[in-house]
């Protein structure tokens, strides 16, 4: 071996010798120093370096203990052979079905259903789930089965009883106005006095007799006077000049009928939508034309709402506004 010059001197070097612990080769002089150090490092385990603890030194951050690794769950044995056999059985069943369809013979029975033995079967619906899904499903399926059984009991109990039907109630009939109430509504309108007015060309006796006959008819037709005797029977006893008891007791109905006749006969409908009635030779506009509550708010033809209250025609179809 050639010598190496070190610090101006020549050092004689022998052959390289391997270390018994780590297997590296050293010169004999260096191997004597390396042997005890290598033996010491081999026996002593080195701690793993944690950089988070080094960064947390000198600060208020508490040192967090490292999380221990969770042990891995044991692996279940694979049932590859069973899966392989089920796969072959399904292929053979499909081939047998195709052959039976071609030949036109009877169809073979379907293969039995396959299931995974690792899955847990639900005792209520007979389905299978893995462990996590089975824990959630079984509780839900239990409550659902209890509800369905309760409904079945209730239906069997009420099976013999007839179903209750809601009885139809007819709408309440509106009370028809009696002659007394009709007189209050019609008395607001300006009407001629029937007592003092005489018809031209007709004797006064005929007018009084016609008014009395109308009053008698109203009195006999009204339900409140059913028990009273007919006034014409009393008229035979009393003289003709005296007024009959029907007019003496209640003279208003005869006058009201005359007023009502004159009002209805003189009712005129104008083409512009206003209604007028001629009383005592004068024209008076009807209440229906003036009050907005009696006019329809929507068109009866197209259903469009009138933009203003005083509109007379529909702005969409042009139909005249209807008076209710």
Curated annotation (Swiss-Prot):
Residues 43-83, 150-224, 236-259 are annotated as: Disordered. InterPro entries: ZC2HC1A/B-like (IPR026319), Znf_C2HC_C3H (IPR049899). Residues 176-187, 196-215 have a biased composition (Low complexity). The modification Phosphothreonine is found at residue 243. The keyword Ribosomal protein does not apply. One of its GO terms (molecular function) is zinc ion binding. It holds the Pfam family zf-C2HC_2. Zn(2+) 2 binds at residues 122, 125, 137, 141. The keyword Zinc-finger applies. Keywords: Metal-binding, Phosphoprotein, Repeat, Zinc, Zinc-finger. A zinc finger (C2HC/C3H-type) spans 15-44, 118-147. Gene3D superfamilies: Classic Zinc Finger (3.30.160.60). The modification Phosphoserine is found at residues 222, 291. Zn(2+) 1 binds at residues 19, 22, 34, 38. Its cofactor is Zn(2+). Residues 48-58 have a biased composition (Basic and acidic residues). Disulfide bonds: none annotated. Belongs to the ZC2HC1 family. This is Zinc finger C2HC domain-containing protein 1A. It comes from Pongo abelii. The gene is ZC2HC1A.
